[in-house]
Amino acid sequence: VIRFEQVSVRYDGTDRPTLSGVDLAVPEGELVLLVGPSGVGKSTLLGTVSGLVPHFTGGVLSGRVTVDGRDTRTHKPRELADLVGTVGQDPQAHFVTDTVEDELAYGMESLGLAPDVMRRRVEETLDLLGLAELRDRPIATLSGGQQQRVAIGSVLTPHPKVLVLDEPTSALDPAAAEEVLAVLQRLVHDLGTTVLMAEHRLERVVQYADQVVLLPAPGAAPVMGAPADIMAVSPVRPPVAELGLLAGWDPLPLSVRDARRGAGGLRARLESASPPAPSELPTPSKPSAPSELSTPSKPSAPSELAADVSVAGPPVPSGQRLGRLARLLGRTKAVEAPGPADPVTRVESLSVRRGRIEALRRVTLTVAPGETVALMGRNGAGKSTLLSALVGMVEPTSGSVRVGGLAPARTDPRAMIRRVGLVPQEPRDLLYADTVAAECAAADRDAGADEGTCRALVTELLPGVEDGTHPRDLSEGQRLALALALVLTARPPLLLLDEPTRGLDYAAKGRLVGVLRALAAEGHAIVLATHDVELAAELAHRVVILADGEVVADGPTGRVVVSSPAFAPQTAKILAPQEWLTVSQVRGALEAGA
């Protein structure tokens, strides 16, 4: 149903094509997964199917893309709307109405469908995606994950023959992601819908794919084949496949169920070893305040403090990175604390009401210097609201929030910027200037820092990016690194991140983990709201699970996630009842002779 014939795309001002030599056919009624590192042109390839490339994005498209016989070069996106449904990485960019029900109906109204057909399809979609309780809600009041489901629903209601989805589960909690993928699988199997999907969180989707298309590098010709065959050679692969390669399993498993069937031998090899205890992980037990911290002499492991968040650039040895970050952030020699440090933030019986909705109820939380806490829970559980309360964007209805002894909502933002910094779910929300240099100059002024402070951090976190680069021209990972540098300019003891791995591939996520571990080792307290269970397993000392605005679990990461079917990482599910969380832990044990 989709055919690419020697397709290449070159954007204005670039010296090489983003896509080149794409020559493949997507069969009708299959779910085809598009994979590859960040920046290889996955979104561009999807855009050629919907007609957004080149009609909306510009650039030159050579070759031919046809969808059910229609040439996308000669048919604009509106002329393909009855055939192709598209959801991009930013669902907010798609919304044209105010409420959930109106948004689901809008596409059908545009196509002139009968009112009784529209009503039936809206009801079906509300039930399919678990949106019935939200039908009258203003879209602006929904969480990011709820908005993602609405965006997917709005393209399902017209019943297109082809669905083009760019990161469709990136903002969804694990349970909601499974529900959406089950719906997509039902559309493929029962209705013959063709789904072309790009997704970085392969652990969620690869088991559902009929075929996988690998874009190995920018401008390189794609490779198409069976999921197991492609995962064996792909530079990006989910933990289940990584563990399978490490253990030498053949065929390569793509699901937890398949991996568990063959994991007996690996479990036996690991019986004599044990996962790192919490005391062996980076620990926040007795750090000094961030302003007094020195560079630790013995980081946890070389791999933990690996290179920057940007895709480009060689790894930096752990000691160098820790030392450079310490110098850039103005650290001085530590004074050994006699006991546990005072918490950076203390939340007591916090409740927040937004209109008729009680977003948080009696939440109590403390975070110590050097501690990393992952907030988890389903969409709408209150994670982003809690981060907003910590930074002062939301005032408590009852209870109290203290950051560095101050109430954030009642303190001048210019004073709070030195105590707490937030990297929002969309890093671009922090980026207003036309160049990286202008962003850095503004960050220095806002933080009262010496000129060049922010630029030095950008150079460390994002090497190779020129001063004149427009922030909107950066990749997702690069924008995240820039936003992180802007926030760190003020050297806040408390760092907050909302869904920091959205849009990042595994390599970029690994580099982000290295940077955040370095910051925690220097004494920064880190609180991150995430649906990424693999990130929590790699990074967090503690996991706090929220449900309907309440804390339902709070404890060491291993203890909380291993017992949870929804929030356990793939490695934990495969090797249970042993308490291994990550492939890197297993690799370390095997290399040590397990």
Q: How would you label these PLM feature ranges?
A:
Residues D116-L134, A449-D467, G477:
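Conserved ABC ATPase "signature" region
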Residues A228-P282, A307-V309, G313, P317-L329, ...:
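ABC ATPase nucleotide-binding domains
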Residues P218-G219, G549:
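Conserved ABC ATPase "signature" C-loop
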Residues V155-L156, L488:
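ABC ATPase C-loop
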Residues V205-Q207, A536-E538:
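A short, surface-exposed alpha-helical micro-motif characterized by mixed small hydrophobic
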Residues E199-H200, T530-H531:
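H-loop/switch region of ABC-family ATPase nucleotide-binding domains
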